[in-house]
């Protein structure tokens, strides 16, 4: 497995593979890898001859300097896991390589609408940082396919729209959320949980599933469901950040024409901000 940290070396290897007629799948990450990331890598192998990953803690997408400073950096362990998973090349740039003129003067990419909704409203600038770094990584790697987790539902929707709007010749593959046996969605942020908090954490998914069951049973009074779910989480020891039930296609308020809803959950448990989502198909008479 090749590990490179500068764009010239990355492009040289990509160019060689292209000359050999090989296809490339890409999995961008911020490191601190878990089984969910490795599932993305496994999926990537099904779509191309070569698999490239990146490990880059992107300062542009953090709205709090403290979160950026505290984000775990586990490069050595991550590279070992990726090599075992059969990755062909890992790109590990520094912020100075990705943003040589600094963040303030760097050109940015922003997806209108989706960047300011829901999670974007709670974390101003976050999705601008995501779309900018993903665009730059796409330009460097020039993949045929890129794999993203469905756990970050809004991020996946944003990247799909960006790729379509900008006519990027890249197939975006959404990969189902990987869960622990007790239902908790795997996340790098789960590492912030204490033992006691980890035992409570599956309540987020249970509450989400309860909402889904109510909707499937015909309860479409969404504000009431949100209020009950928030109360349930807060009673269990969470601090609810946001629960949104919106049209799964547009991420805007559901209408009579909505065919699917997505339940988007975000809540703090101790220091960790946990997210999850579930899509519900509406029964139409």
Curated annotation (Swiss-Prot):
Pathway: Cofactor biosynthesis; (R)-pantothenate biosynthesis; (R)-pantothenate from (R)-pantoate and beta-alanine: step 1/1. ATP binds at residues 30-37, 149-152, 178, 186-189. The active site is at 37 (proton donor). It is found in: Cytoplasm. It comes from the Bacteria. Keywords: ATP-binding, Cytoplasm, Ligase, Nucleotide-binding, Pantothenate biosynthesis. GO terms for molecular function: ATP binding; pantoate-beta-alanine ligase activity. Beta-alanine binds at residue 61. GO terms for biological process: pantothenate biosynthetic process. Its EC number is 6.3.2.1. It holds the Pfam family Pantoate_ligase. (R)-pantoate binds at residues 61, 155. The reaction proceeds by a bi uni uni bi ping pong mechanism. HAMAP family: PanC. This is Pantothenate synthetase. It comes from Aeromonas hydrophila subsp. hydrophila (strain ATCC 7966 / DSM 30187 / BCRC 13018 / CCUG 14551 / JCM 1027 / KCTC 2358 / NCIMB 9240 / NCTC 8049).
């Amino acid at each position: 497995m090749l590990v490179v940290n500068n764009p010239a070396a990355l492009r040289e290897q990509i160019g060689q593979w292209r000359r050999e007629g090989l296809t490339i799948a890409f999995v961008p990450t911020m490191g601190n890898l878990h089984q969910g990331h490795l599932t993305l890598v496994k999926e990537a192998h099904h779509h191309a001859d070569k698999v490239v990953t990146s490990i880059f803690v992107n300062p542009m997408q953090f709205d709090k300097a403290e979160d950026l400073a505290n984000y775990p950096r586990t490069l050595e362990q991550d590279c070992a896991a990726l090599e075992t998973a059969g990755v062909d090349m890992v790109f590990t740039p520094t912020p100075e390589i990705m943003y040589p003129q600094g963040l303030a003067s760097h050109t940015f990419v922003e997806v209108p609408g989706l960047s300011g909704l829901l999670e974007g409203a709670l974390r101003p600038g976050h999705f601008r940082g995501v779309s900018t770094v993903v665009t730059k990584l796409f330009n460097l790697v020039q993949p045929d396919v890129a794999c993203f987790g469905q756990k970050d539902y809004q991020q996946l929707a944003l990247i799909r729209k960006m790729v379509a709007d900008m006519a990027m010749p890249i197939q975006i593959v959404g990969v189902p959320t990987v869960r622990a046996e007790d239902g908790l969605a795997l996340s790098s942020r789960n590492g912030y949980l204490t033992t006691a908090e980890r035992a409570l954490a599956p309540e987020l998914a249970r509450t989400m599933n309860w909402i889904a069951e109510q909707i499937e049973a015909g309860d479409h009074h969404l504000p009431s469901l949100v209020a009950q779910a928030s109360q349930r989480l807060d009673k269990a020891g969470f601090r609810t950040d946001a629960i949104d039930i919106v049209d799964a296609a547009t991420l805007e308020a559901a209408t009579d024409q909505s065919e699917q809803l997505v339940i988007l959950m975000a809540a703090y448990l101790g220091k960790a901000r946990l997210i999850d989502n579930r899509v519900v198909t509406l029964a139409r008479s």
